[in-house]
From Swiss-Prot:
Gene (UniProt): bioB
Family, similarity comment: Belongs to the radical SAM superfamily. Biotin synthase family.
Swiss-Prot/TrEMBL cofactor(s): [4Fe-4S] cluster; [2Fe-2S] cluster
HAMAP family cross-referenced by the UniProt entry: BioB (MF_01694)
Entry's transmembrane regions: none
Taxonomic superkingdom: Bacteria
Identification of the protein by name: Biotin synthase
GO biological process: biotin biosynthetic process
Known role: Catalyzes the conversion of dethiobiotin (DTB) to biotin by the insertion of a sulfur atom into dethiobiotin via a radical-based mechanism.
Residues that bind [2Fe-2S] cluster: 146, 183, 243, 313
Amino acid sequence: MIQFIRPKTASGKTIVVQLSASPPQTPPPTDTNALKNWLEILSQRIINGDRLTKTEALTLTQIDGQDNILLLCEAADRIRQACCGNVVDLCSIINVKSGNCSENCQFCSQSVHHQGENSPIYGLKSSEEILAQAKAAEVAGAKRFCLVSQGRGPKYNSPQSGEFEKILETVRQITTETNIKPCCALGEVTLEQAEALKEAGVTRYNHNLEASENYYQSIVSTHSWGDRVETVKNLKKAGIQACTGGIMGMGETWEDRVDLAISLRELEVDSVPINLLNPREGTPLGHLPKLDVFDALKAIAIFRFLLPEQILRYAGGREAVMGELQSLGLKSGINAMLIGHYLTTLGQPPENDHAMLESLGLQGGEAPIPGEYKKKTQKKAH
């Protein structure tokens, strides 16, 4: 058993965490050719259906240097091609209610505990405004459109507000008047609420774990990691696909990142947003430097090794962190991305994203859910 002390938590307390020591890891080969061969063998194992162990994933985290990380990315891209194909899932989001959030997530500028500078504050948008943006997203090439709201979630909202029913009605309008698929990210929901969303037409729901179970208490104290897991399980019970990922660059360790990916694998989520922290002024994490581009690529590649068939989605921070190198993520395991603007920050024009995909020989559309692509290719082979 080992003991270490986390930095200050969301509640301002110091937490001593007890963890079992990880198994000893064999360092990856240092010779370039040996590393390339080793990664080819490992990636083929994953393609053949093996699961990467935590020890193996931690070994991948030891790969350093830009050239070696690019070799890791190439191996992850082989897994993506074999398990997911070349269609990149495109979605867009709308912030339907913003600011004054009761939760104290240290990365978020919408929290009432530390309202970020220039963070918008407004109540629930009208169905007409949301529908208009859904239609615009469809024209821009998005296949899914997610309604995102601040707050802990409908599970804790007053029924008298009527907001949940208004969301359900807006979802029905979107399914009736467009061909885009509506998703939601409203926070925690009960099983009954998840079933109501499913009946209204929601097929996928975003509810991120944000970080590993061990690191979560360092960034949020107003609710628990287990609360978020409970909502993911409610969604799956209701027959809604779980779009569940996290944020890289909040001060977490490589082991935290590996643990998050393994938790997502155990939950059997369908889509995994990979957010790259874009530090916002006025938030407790606003002082952090942006994640190194090659650390971001390494994280993406390791997630692909651990989640070979899941939809891995470029999400918030893509442009801000990756800059002109963002196309490398699409050759490192990514097979989905948000297009258009984010919740409180701007994205690049959708036409730029389409041009980037075309230049890489990829096609925007709707990516297969886990297992679907391999089933299709196996049928064709027979």
